[in-house]
Amino acid sequence: MYRKSALELRDAVVNREISVTAITEYFYHRIESYDEQIGSFLSLCKERALLRASRIDDKLAKGDPIGILAGIPIGVKDNIHITGVKTTCASKMLENFVAPFDATVVRRIEMEDGILLGKLNMDEFAMGSTTRYSAFQHTNNPWDLERVPGGSSGGSAAAVSARFCPIALGSDTGGSIRQPAAFCGVVGFKPSYGAVSRYGLVAFGSSLDQIGPLTTVVEDVALAMDAFAGRDIKDATTRDFFRGTFSQALSLEVPKLIGVPRGFLDGLQEDCKENFFEALAVMERQGSRIIDIDLSVLKHAVPVYYIVASAEAATNLARFDGVRYGHRCAQADNMQEMYARSRKEGFGKEVTRRILLGNYVLSAERQNIFYKKGTAVRATLIEAFQSAFECCDVIAMPVCASPAIRDTDVLDPVSLYLQDIYTVAVNLAYLPAISVPSGLSKEGLPLGVQFIGKRGADQQICQVGYSFQEHSQIKQLYPKAVNGLFDGGME
C-alpha cells in the first residue's frame, strides 16, 4: 500500500477497494514499526484519526458525498494547530501548549475528509536546516540514518520519504520545505506568499512564512493545494490567485523559456552541478529553451534574509514570556527575573541566537544601518526577479549545494546559514517554487532541482515540476537505510 500515491489511495477508497480505517491502521503500523529509527513524528492522534476514518467509511456506506482527500493520511508539522493536540514547535517553551483551535489548512483538510495522523518533528520554532535544533529528538534521514533530513520541516520530509504518510504539511520561511524535500528524495512545494492561509501557523517570519505540502509525486501536491489553497477571511494576506484546479493545470503546455542564473552556480558540489545540468537537458528535450539570466543581486540574499527573518522572529517570539504564553520558570524574585529565566529555560541556543540578532538589528542605534538597508535591498531583489521574468517564464536553480550532510559534518551556525543561498530569495520575493527529485549523487543520496515562478503562478510551477517528473522518469524514490521499511512484507 505504501507504493500508492495519495491520488491512488483516494481512488481505491472511492472504488470501495479498501476502507479508510484499513488505510489508517496500515500507516500507523508502519510508523509504530519503523519510526523509532527515524524520529519523524513527535506525537500521534491515533484515536482521533481512527474515529474520523470510521465516520468516512460510514459516509461511503450510505452513498454520501466524500471529499477530495478521502482516506488520505496526512502528517502535520508541529507549528500548525490541531484543536486539542499539543503544538510544541519542538520547543521546551511550548512543551505543554494544547492548541485551542484548528489552523485553516487543518480545517480545510478535514472538510475534504483527510486523516490527520499526528505532529511531525522540526527545528525549534522552524529555525534551522537540520532538524537537530528540536528540543525533543533528532530526526534521521531515511536514506542514511547518520545524515540529517534537512530542516526545518525535516520530520515532514522524512515521514513522506519513509512512506509513513503520502502527504505532509510543512512551512517554508527560507527553504524549510524545499531543502529537506531535496535531502530526502521527495517533492516539496512552497506556494506564493498569500496563496495558503497562515491562520493557525505559529509565526517565525510573518512576511516570509508559507505553509505547503511535501509528497512523493507532484500530482499529490496539486491535490493538496486544491484542498486548502485560496483566500481566507482569517488571514488578510491571502489572495485568490488561481483559476481552475491545480490538478487540471498539470496538463497545460510546458513554458518555453527557462532562465538559469549560471553565474550563481559556482558553489555547487561537482556531482550536484552535473545533476543540475542533466535536469536542464530534460527540460530542453521537452521543447523548452534554456537562457542565461542576470540575478547577481542574489549574492546579497542570505544576509538580507537573516536580517529580515531575525527581526521578525524577535518580534513574534516576544509573546512567549511565561505570562501570556509558554514555559514559566519555577521560581523568581521579581517579574523581570521571571521573564528572563522563563525565556532562558524555554528557548534553545539557535532560537536565542536569532532573537539576539533580531533585537540587535532593530535597536535604535542599528536599525538604519541594518534593518532599513536590508529591506531596501529586499526591494531591489524583488525588482531583479521581475526583470528576469520579463525574459523567461520560469527560473531553474539547484535547491542545495550538496546532498544531505552527516551529523559529524554539521557546520557552525554561520556556515549553515550560507547553505540557504539557493532558497531564501524565493521567500524574500514572495514567489512560488517547487523542489522535485532529480536523481542521486555519487554516494547514492537524493538530489533535487528547483523551479521558480512569478508570484501567483503556482499552478504553472506545479505543471513544470510534473512535466520534469514524467520526462525524467525519476519518480517514487525509495530509501534503503532502514531494514524492512520497503522489503519487510508490509505491502
Swiss-Prot record:
Top-level taxon of origin: Bacteria
Protein name: Glutamyl-tRNA(Gln) amidotransferase subunit A
Record EC number: 6.3.5.7
Function: Allows the formation of correctly charged Gln-tRNA(Gln) through the transamidation of misacylated Glu-tRNA(Gln) in organisms which lack glutaminyl-tRNA synthetase. The reaction takes place in the presence of glutamine and ATP through an activated gamma-phospho-Glu-tRNA(Gln).
UniProt record similarity statement: Belongs to the amidase family. GatA subfamily.
Record GO cellular component, one term: glutamyl-tRNA(Gln) amidotransferase complex
Keyword Nucleotide-binding: yes
Pfam family, one: Amidase
Catalytically driven reaction(s): L-glutamyl-tRNA(Gln) + L-glutamine + ATP + H2O = L-glutaminyl-tRNA(Gln) + L-glutamate + ADP + phosphate + H(+)
Family annotation (HAMAP family): GatA
Known partners and oligomeric status: Heterotrimer of A, B and C subunits.
Active site: K77 (charge relay system), S152 (charge relay system), S176 (acyl-ester intermediate)
Protein biosynthesis listed as a keyword: yes
Annotated GO biological process: translation
PROSITE patterns recorded: AMIDASES
Organism: Chlamydia muridarum (strain MoPn / Nigg)
Keywords per UniProt: ATP-binding, Ligase, Nucleotide-binding, Protein biosynthesis
InterPro entries reported in the protein's UniProt record: Amidase (IPR000120), Amidase_CS (IPR020556), Amidase_dom (IPR023631), AS_sf (IPR036928), GatA (IPR004412)
Enzyme class, spelled out: ligase
GO molecular function per UniProt: ATP binding; glutaminyl-tRNA synthase (glutamine-hydrolyzing) activity
